[in-house]
Amino acid sequence: MPKLKAPKKSAPKKQAPDPPGCRAGLPHIPADYGLKPRKHYLPFSHAEERLAKSRNYWICTARPDGRPHSIPVWGFWIDGVLYFGTGRASRKARNLAHNAAVSIHLDSGDDVVILEGTAVEIDLSDKSQLKKLDAASRAKYKMPMVVGPGNVIYSVRPRVVLAWTEKDFPNNATRWKFDTASA
């Protein structure tokens, strides 16, 4: 009887490089989980795809008295930055005026992406920026971007991004840290 040949092992897929100024590593997970530093983490493209495709983004801010506030918004992931708008009198805008630190996560608890950063109000007189955001809104939500004196649009560059999938947790849990100087 002829010997069966073992299937050839394919070379591991080459991971796309992470963005400049970004380092992948392990998130802070208790030692009981048994995680050890490894050579390969989730590629940042995994997080970027989820951020770009997500319909809703949960924005988490803190009230001036420190109490948390979470609310879903629509937004756009464009060129490594998350944009979202709101009414200037909204709770989230008032919170961000007091403390611009923000944590943002997507809907899924099975394919997790969490972004931490600082919300920066964009200049509404920058017509090229508004045109880009309006085009993104029309493509994604089939409606124009709402811009006016009662509104504010924020940009959030990531400082930290966390991601994992439920089926491979904790083995694929990944944290990307961004150099703030490169933002």
Residue ranges and their predicted role:
Residues 43-46, 69-71, 89, 141:
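A generic local structural motif
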